[in-house]
């Protein structure tokens, strides 16, 4: 799980009920194979994360100066009205594709299932014209999200809402090989048991969040990991949904290694979405902006 820094208010996790998927809605969602409406995000995807939209002009300049058009995850803060993000999302969408994170995993437990559904509807209604990908669940298998039944209910309901409006939906899983607290939360085991079959077939994107700092510095065999993920989600574009480190001496090496990684799995699209873009690459004069831009230029395509 990433380190939450800058203007984040503290908080943590949630409680129980699995939705009975309304038969008509489930059949519509599971059968839906049409291309989502809105802009098609080209591949490979060069992702970054913006967790604070202040200094908007500096953010958009850093984004627009990159060698290739990026895709920017905007983290929608907890208990914030979507109107707050209207101008930032519009301005960022002019220089970048946009992935909207409905709620960071750290705060999922603070929302009831009904509140999560309400939040999804509110953000979709306010920003659907400028958000290209909707991240309906973030680090969804993390032990800190609360009661599993509630987590699944939030994920599936948000997915159903997004797909009922023919928008692109993403789920981010948390890679935790040998560093999980509960065996049931191991990434593949949790996804197999808790992601419904219609979502396994219908998700537009499935991302992996991974922080080496969380897993004792483990460097997994990512080719094998993504090959296995592809089997579970055969129709989804796959890649990294979060990477990063808070260790200053490691940032440049991590950036270069992840963004230039060569993975040959079909439907692998990169992603990466460096969590600390707002802190590390804004303004454009920061050294790590140059490192990121060089890594994007060198990335396989």
Language-model region placement:
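Bacterial N-terminal signal peptides
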Residues: 19-27
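Sec-dependent signal peptide recognition
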Residues: 3-6, 14-20
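Substrate-binding cleft of secreted/luminal carbohydrate-active enzymes
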Residues: 239-301
């Amino acid at each position: 799980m990433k380190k939450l820094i800058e203007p984040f208010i503290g908080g943590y996790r949630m409680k129980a009920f699995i939705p009975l998927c309304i038969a008509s809605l489930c059949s519509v969602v599971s059968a839906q194979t049409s291309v989502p409406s809105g802009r098609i995000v080209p591949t490979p995807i060069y992702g970054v994360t913006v967790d604070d939209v202040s200094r908007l002009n500096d953010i958009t300049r850093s984004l627009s100066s990159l060698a290739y058009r990026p895709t920017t995850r905007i983290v929608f803060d907890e208990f914030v009205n979507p109107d707050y993000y209207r101008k930032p999302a519009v301005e960022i969408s002019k220089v970048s594709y946009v992935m909207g994170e409905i709620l960071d995993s750290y705060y999922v437990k603070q929302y009831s299932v009904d509140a999560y559904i309400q939040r999804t509807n509110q953000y979709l209604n306010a920003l659907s014209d400028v958000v290209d990908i909707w991240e309906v669940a973030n680090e969804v298998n993390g032990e800190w999200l609360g009661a599993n039944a509630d987590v699944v209910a939030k994920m599936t309901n948000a997915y159903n809402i997004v797909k009922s409006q023919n928008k692109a939906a993403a789920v981010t899983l948390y890679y935790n090989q040998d560093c999980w607290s509960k065996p049931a939360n191991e990434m593949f085991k949790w996804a197999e048991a808790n992601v419904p079959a219609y979502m396994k077939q219908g998700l537009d994107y499935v991302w992996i969040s991974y922080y080496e700092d969380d897993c004792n510095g483990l460097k997994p065999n990512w080719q094998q990991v993504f090959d296995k993920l592809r089997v579970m989600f055969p129709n989804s574009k796959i890649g990294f949904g979060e990477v990063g480190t808070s260790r200053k001496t490691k940032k440049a090496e991590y950036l270069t290694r992840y963004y230039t990684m060569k993975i040959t799995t079909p439907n692998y699209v990169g992603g990466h979405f460096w969590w600390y873009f707002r802190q590390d690459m804004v303004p454009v004069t920061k050294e790590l902006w140059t490192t990121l831009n060089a890594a994007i230029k060198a990335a396989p395509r």
